Amino acid sequence: TRFEPVAIVAQSYALPGAFSAEELWNRVIAGADLLGPVPERRWRVDPARLLAAELAVTTLDRVTSLRGGYVRGFDDRFDPSGFSLPAAEIHGLDPLFKLVFHTAREAFLGVRGGPALRARTGLVLANLSFPSSGLSHFAEQVWSGVPARNRIDARNRFSSGLPALLAARALDLGLADRAFALDAACASSLYAVKLACDALQDGEADLMLAAAVSRADDLFIHMGFTALKALSPTGRSRPFHHEADGLVPAEGAGCVALRRLGDAVRDGERILAVIRGIGLGNDGRGHGLLAPAEEGQVKAMSAAYASAGLAPEDIGLLECHATGTRVGDAVEIRSTSRVFGAHTVPAGSVVHVNGDPTNRW
């Protein structure tokens, strides 16, 4: 079955160093480094106490780098008023919730036919199932015996799926009860877009918000990737580079508003891009998260181009995963080379935020 084209008609972002696509582009063009040290008091412990100089750490409570991509100044931009939830309630929620609220609202307001479509609007959220800062804080309060009446909002316990439902309800979306979140690791945002497109193509919705957020407990992330020996000890993101030594965690959120292309054209929407095909794959019983299967990537890319009615030679720009881990990058180079063959295409990394995102093959 041919993929019915879907238009991206609005977008919104809250990213390290940028709160819009234009700001991010300008930062990239300027070669700005959007990575930096962990914000003060973010970890609730002196980061210097946790830093291990060597990668081969012998305990699980150390980190090999204190750098990451952090959204700074968000509280000055986020307005908790105007939602169907009281501002006081929103104030007590973890920043992860607020990032989703903010980007979903901005994307919805960017749709020209938004108000008329509200009753037929849904939301899908890509959100990794890691503990948030709020969940960690709540757990600390429980363990330390803080009375229930004095604890932070208990909804912070549910930082994986609840943000999608609360955001949809806060925006009074007609399909709010169908809003959901998903975790497909690094492919989560692509799955969110695919499932949002499915809802449009099946006639279940007329407008879909496909959102993604990364705002887990940053100490948990740094320790976890250190234990996996996947965290860059130099704190530098260097995808497809011979000196790449791991990934650098970053936080942020984004949301795109999607409509069927024919409807978007009819209603005079501003069309930012058109999705003509999507390919998905799963490694199944593979080697693990840090050792993706080459064959699975080849099948996913081939399926995407087939559903779009395109050939690899038709592609002018390729955005790669390219985390900066040597095994993962090597697999991606091989799979992409198999799909594109002799066709040379400019390539960049969608996760590279230190100001040098374009790598040409």
Features from the language model and the residues they span:
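Condensing-enzyme catalytic core of the thiolase-fold
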Residues: R2-W361
